């Protein structure tokens, strides 16, 4: 599909617009602004990733993908490739709205009977039986192919680089992760993956 004249997108947990009001300086959240638009995100690193994409010719969809992927690196407990993605995209040229539901599916074998055999009467809050098959990455691919100006690999490059090189962990995230240590210790696989040896 040829590049759309303008795309304005809203992706869960990522908001983009082309007009920035003055930031309320009584709050501590950062805002990163570029000539081609603004990107708002919980993490300044994520906002910067989106801005870089805008500055190098990407559109709002590309920036949203880059921002969401970076959030998955710097705040994996809140966002990213292990979760769902929902998007409403407005194509200004055609005046049409497009919706994408990239929520994951429960595994085929995840039945009520299976859970009952495990002694569970309700959905567990932790562990392998508490999750679905992630849909975010497939959603990123579909959005990039249909509405993006860049390839998905280009949109993901900032987050891949950050994951490989490391990043400063904000105080709030460090506190959140520290508070999760006891929960991680209850699961041998999680403990061996996420806790220091």
Q: Where do the model's predicted regions map?
A:
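N-terminal secretory signal peptides that target proteins for export/translocation
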Residues: 1-3
């Amino acid at each position: 599909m040829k590049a759309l004249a303008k795309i304005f997108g809203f992706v869960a947990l990522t908001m983009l617009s082309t007009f920035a009001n003055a930031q309320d300086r009584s709050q501590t959240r950062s805002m990163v602004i570029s000539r081609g638009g603004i990107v708002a995100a919980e993490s300044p690193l994520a906002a910067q990733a989106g801005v870089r994409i805008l500055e190098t010719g990407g559109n709002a969809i590309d920036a949203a993908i880059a921002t969401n992927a970076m959030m998955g690196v710097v705040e994996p407990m809140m966002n990213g490739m292990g979760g769902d993605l929902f998007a409403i995209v407005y194509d200004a040229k055609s005046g049409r709205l497009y919706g994408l539901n990239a929520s994951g599916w429960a595994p085929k074998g995840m039945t009520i009977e299976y859970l009952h055999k495990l002694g569970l009467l309700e959905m567990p809050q932790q562990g392998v039986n508490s999750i679905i098959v992630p849909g975010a990455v497939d959603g990123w691919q579909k959005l990039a192919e249909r509405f993006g100006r860049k390839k998905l690999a280009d949109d993901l490059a900032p987050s891949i680089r950050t994951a490989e090189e490391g990043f400063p962990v904000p105080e709030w995230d460090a506190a959140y992760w520290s508070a999760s240590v006891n929960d991680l210790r209850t699961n041998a696989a999680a403990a061996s993956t996420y806790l220091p040896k």
